Amino acid sequence: MSIQVFCDFDGTITNNDNIMSIMEKFAPPEAEEVKNRILSQELSIQEGVSQLFQLIPTNLHDEIIQFLIETAEIRNGFHEFIQFVNENNISFYVISGGMDFFVYPLLQGLIPKEQIYCNETDFSNEYITVNWPHPCDRHCQNHCGLCKSSLIRKLGDTNDFHIVIGDSITDLQAAKQADKVFARDFLITKCEENHISYTPFETFHDVQTELKHLLEVKL
């Protein structure tokens, strides 16, 4: 049995949710209602996120990138955590509902591109269009956009020990099928509502300590 780690990006690897930061900085006021409808599960993630980015003009591309480079912060302990998983031959994947135009640059030099799964964006028209290269498989009907539970089924083996690390509603379906969940922020609320066992964390030092203990127990 091998251990596989599936980790969210926005609000998990980074301290802030980059999509929400973009919306607060660049989107018109109606983005707030869309955001609330996503969180209340009135809108599917795919539909809601598509609507949010359709509010952002594509001519802001360079300004958005510069804004994120200046404001996005990698969560404390992440660099050491990646070193730890590499040293212990633990498979690590970033499964992000975020967008290629900011996920790849912010993780450059940290995570190989082939271990990153995120959404794609099209800037060829007046407003940003989101493309969804990792949709739900036949086992999921939640219109996730990037379907994290489907990616776990695709990348993992039924005999593997699956760990999910996340912070929000977008991580809920993955958490439902994980063997162990590390949760913070809104994902804690959703785990408790759905009676999903979880370990809270604030830094990746917390996750590394727990994972080290898990390795000792399983070995």
Swiss-Prot record:
MF terms in GO: 2-hydroxy-3-keto-5-methylthiopentenyl-1-phosphate phosphatase activity
A Gene Ontology biological process term: L-methionine salvage from methylthioadenosine
EC number: 3.1.3.87
Reactions catalysed: 2-hydroxy-5-methylsulfanyl-3-oxopent-1-enyl phosphate + H2O = 1,2-dihydroxy-5-(methylsulfanyl)pent-1-en-3-one + phosphate
Pfam families registered for this protein in UniProt: HAD
Keywords recorded for this protein, A-Z: Amino-acid biosynthesis, Hydrolase, Methionine biosynthesis
Pathway it works in: Amino-acid biosynthesis; L-methionine biosynthesis via salvage pathway; L-methionine from S-methyl-5-thio-alpha-D-ribose 1-phosphate: step 4/6
Top-level division of the source organism's lineage: Bacteria
Gene3D superfamilies in the record: 3.90.1470.20, HAD superfamily/HAD-like
InterPro entries: HAD-like_hydrolase_phosphatase, HAD-like_sf, HAD-SF_hydro_IB_MtnX, HAD_hydro_PyrdxlP_Pase-like, HAD_sf
Function recorded in the entry: Dephosphorylates 2-hydroxy-3-keto-5-methylthiopentenyl-1-phosphate (HK-MTPenyl-1-P) yielding 1,2-dihydroxy-3-keto-5-methylthiopentene (DHK-MTPene).
Sequence similarity: Belongs to the HAD-like hydrolase superfamily. MtnX family.
NCBIfam families: DKMTPPase-SF, HAD-SF-IB, PRK09552.1, salvage_mtnX
PANTHER family in UniProt: PHOSPHORIC MONOESTER HYDROLASE, UPF0655 PROTEIN YCR015C
Protein name listed in UniProt: 2-hydroxy-3-keto-5-methylthiopentenyl-1-phosphate phosphatase
Source species: Bacillus thuringiensis subsp. konkukian (strain 97-27)
